[in-house]
């Protein structure tokens, strides 16, 4: 499966993809009578993706390049990822909670696994 970030395609396996719909309010306040009053900004589609361990040298190179992009000090990126139904979804996002785990370290190479990232949408998918 592929993922596209800022027009660059990365051929990496996706082992899990969790999509959330987060509602953001301009304000939300509960009055003394217990009623919630709110002004909804919109619904943001955010994703958490876990990438699998590479199975060949090309995937290993793509995973290393993906790590560098995910850890750049850049405010926003254009990403295209499959949504929960496998349909390509393109949106502007920032990256959060980027992490990977050490699989094996040798004198010649370091091998990583379980690269995980959260894509947080810049703007809402749906608005009132």
Locations of regions flagged by a protein language model:
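Extracellular/virion structural assembly segments
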Residues: 1-128
């Amino acid at each position: 499966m592929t993922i596209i970030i800022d027009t660059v395609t990365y051929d990496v396996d996706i082992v899990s993809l969790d999509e959330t719909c987060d509602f953001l309010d301009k304000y939300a306040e509960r009055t003394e009578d217990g009623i919630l009053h709110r002004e909804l900004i919109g619904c943001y589609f955010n994703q958490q993706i876990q990438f699998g361990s590479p199975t060949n040298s090309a995937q290993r190179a793509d995973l290393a390049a993906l790590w560098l992009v995910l850890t750049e000090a850049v405010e926003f990126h254009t990403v295209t990822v499959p949504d929960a139904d496998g349909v390509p979804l393109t949106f502007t996002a920032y990256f959060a909670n980027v992490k990977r785990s050490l699989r094996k370290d040798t004198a010649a190479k370091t091998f990583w696994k379980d690269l995980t990232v959260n894509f947080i949408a810049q703007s809402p998918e749906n608005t009132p």
